[in-house]
Amino acid sequence: MPLTIRKANINDLLKTFEWANEKEVIKNSIERSKKIEINEHSTWFKKYITLKFSSLFIVSLRSEKIGLVRIDYKKKEFFLSYLVDRKKRNKGYGYQMLNKIIKKFKNKKKVFKARVKRSNLASNSIFIKLGFKIKYTNQDKNTFLYRLET
């Protein structure tokens, strides 16, 4: 069954809040190390979905929301981050959703980048499978920066 991708809207606020507070999401996050409160998430989410140089996409399988892909645009670079619902992990959906997003924007001659913790083996594997190359390693933050030119 093919995945569908659409821009996030206000109706996705609670689901994205739930995902943001999942144990594995927090563990693999570069930006934070603890749960967030609904007020903080709500403020961020409402602002984020209106930003000109960022996009948040909800990924669904049939009518079930199974993950999201976030893109931050800087010049001609697309910085990617994503998550998959804990019930849908290890089934290939992370690869499928990122591949679909990359294909959606491929004709725009962009550079895709992603920062991933070394310990996040699943995401490291997915970005390599998608053709990303390691641009550099940040020893302090224990992360890789991946890059893909289209």
PLM region spans:
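C-terminal "cap" of GNAT-fold acetyltransferases
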Residues: 139-150
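Conserved GNAT acetyl-CoA-binding A-motif
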Residues: 106-117
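Hydrophobic adenine-recognition pocket in adenosine-nucleotide-binding enzymes
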Residues: 8, 84, 116
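Conserved active-site alpha-helix within GNAT-family acetyltransferase domains
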Residues: 95, 118-136
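A short, well-structured alpha-helix characteristic of acyl/acetyltransferase catalytic modules
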Residues: 1-32
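Conserved acetyl-CoA pyrophosphate-binding loop and the N-cap/start of the following alpha-helix
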Residues: 88, 92-101
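Acetyl-CoA-dependent GNAT
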Residues: 34-87, 138
